[in-house]
Amino acid sequence: MNVLAGKVAIVTGAARGIGAVVAEYLARDGADVVLVGRDERALTAHARHLDETYPERESLAVACDVTDEAGVRAMTEQAVARFGGLDILVNTAGVTGPIETAAQDYGVAEFRDVLDINVVGTFLPCKYVIPHLIARGGGRIVNVAGTSGLRGYPNRVGYSSSKWAVRGLTRTLALELGPHDITVNDVCPNVTKGGRMDRIVAEKARRLGKTETEVYSEYTASTALGRFVEEADVADAISFLVSPAARNITGHDVPVDAGWDV
């Protein structure tokens, strides 16, 4: 179904992982998609794939560091110049930072880096896209928070703090932008199967003296469904939140966690 036909979406972190799947799903649903990230080669390849697979709409790949204000402003202007306006923003860009690291051992530079990418890198695209959503008479913003922003997360102080901040940003913008018919929500994935999770498990196993299989089993045992979340699960939730069916959902967290927070 082309429920997003005629819509223009920006997806940050679109070179790989959740962002790449989100870009695919929005293109599948008919949207023109601006793929944003730092890996220009991967972005260009994915944009080409989307245009070949869904030729009735278009893609634009823009290499951009979401923590760089001038770069985000230029990216937004380039998107508007290409497509004439904007309707949807999905912020998936983010980093994990140090894991299994006590607060007293967590470097200040590392803490700032995680907050810069995860929080400032979510705020800046919002800042520059919002005027264009208002000009369209409405729109959708979806941020990626995480279950680590729903509870305390020991030994991951930078990441957890950043995801709590993203949830606060989401709620504040929902109140500010409601009068403009702009919905703002976030999704909260639990640990998500993929390359980043594989690296986290390997590092956690090394630090704790366990096997990777043991660490994986501990993660899945903590969920009601006994399994990992996959990138497609998160992309499905985001696809719904930017669709017409979600027009009266705003200011909310949508856990995609296989029942971790039950």
Segments predicted by a language model, with ranges:
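Substrate-binding pocket helix/loop in short-chain dehydrogenase/reductase
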Residues: I99-A103, G107-R112, I141, Y219
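Active-site helix of classical SDR
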Residues: C126, S162, T170
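Short, small/polar-rich loop/turn modules that mediate ligand/substrate recognition or access, typified
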Residues: G178, T183, I249-G251
